[in-house]
């Protein structure tokens, strides 16, 4: 099956912030946790989907292998080894439902593996009205499997109109900002929020780079990193 590129068109998409202890919410739907971590060699995980509304909500939950292109778009590929139970559930008002999942067998590779659990609200036939389009909600939860030693390792290079930041490490990072400093010590900070997956890269638009760019610093949820700049 062809990969799907995640879109928020006609959907209310709640981005799951890593490290948060609060549930991710979209309308009346919520999920907890907002990021799932599975230890190396393990397969099982779970997710609680809540309905804070005043009417029943039916949801479909699916698991996808997850990657990102260098423009920052999520690529979701159906993964038959990612099993979700139940895949479809109706949740009563002000109630919640536990969803269990089983990941594909661990291949033993040292690099972190990543998926996304997608929770989609399904149309409610009782709410259908002629000429009215229902707004359906979506929640997207990242799932990571890695050992405790997994960590990012960044390099950077100049790309047309921006800076290409690559992660050659074994673990992901949730980037929050990138600071560029020139030889005179003048710094420009770009507030950017994105996941940089293990083995992945992203081009960060910068416009014109500082003359004599001398240092790059990435601030992420995992810490702050001085990033070497590759010379042409």
Question: What are these model-predicted stretches?
Answer:
Residues 8-18:
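Bacterial N-terminal signal peptides
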Residues 20-26:
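Sec/Tat signal peptide C-region and signal peptidase I cleavage site
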Residues 26-53, 88, 148-158:
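Beta-sheet-dominated interaction scaffolds and their linkers
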Residues 27-30, 52-98:
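Surface-exposed binding patches on compact interaction domains or structured appendages
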Residues 47-53, 163-171:
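Asparagine-centered strand-capping/turn motif at beta-strand->loop junctions
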Residues 65-78, 126-127, 181-189:
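Short aromatic-acidic-glycine turn motif
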Residues 74-107, 186-211:
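Intrinsically disordered, low-complexity Pro/Gly/Ser/Thr-rich segments with frequent PxxP/GP/PP motifs
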Residues 104-150, 210-232:
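Terminal connector regions
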């Amino acid at each position: 099956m062809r990969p799907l590129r995640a879109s928020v068109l006609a959907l209310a998409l709640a981005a799951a912030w890593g490290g948060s202890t609060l549930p991710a919410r979209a309308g009346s739907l919520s999920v907890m946790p907002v990021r799932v971590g599975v230890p190396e060699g393990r397969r099982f995980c779970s997710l609680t989907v809540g309905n804070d509304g005043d009417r029943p909500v039916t949801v479909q939950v699916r698991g996808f292998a997850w990657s990102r292109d260098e423009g920052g778009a999520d690529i979701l590929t159906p993964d038959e080894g990612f099993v979700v139970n139940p895949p479809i559930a109706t949740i009563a008002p002000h109630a919640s439902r536990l969803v269990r999942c089983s990941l594909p067998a661990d291949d033993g590779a040292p690099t972190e593996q990543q998926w996304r659990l997608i929770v989609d609200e399904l149309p409610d036939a009782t709410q259908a009205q002629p000429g009215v389009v229902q707004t359906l909600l979506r929640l997207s939860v990242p799932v990571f499997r890695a050992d405790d030693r997994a960590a990012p390792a960044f390099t950077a290079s100049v790309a047309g109109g921006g800076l290409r930041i690559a992660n050659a490490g074994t673990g992901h990072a949730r980037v929050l900002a990138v600071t560029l400093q020139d030889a005179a010590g003048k710094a420009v900070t770009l507030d950017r929020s994105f996941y940089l997956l293990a083995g992945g890269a992203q081009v960060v638009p910068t416009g014109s780079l500082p003359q004599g760019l001398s240092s790059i610093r990435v601030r992420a949820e995992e810490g702050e990193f001085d990033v070497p700049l590759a010379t042409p």
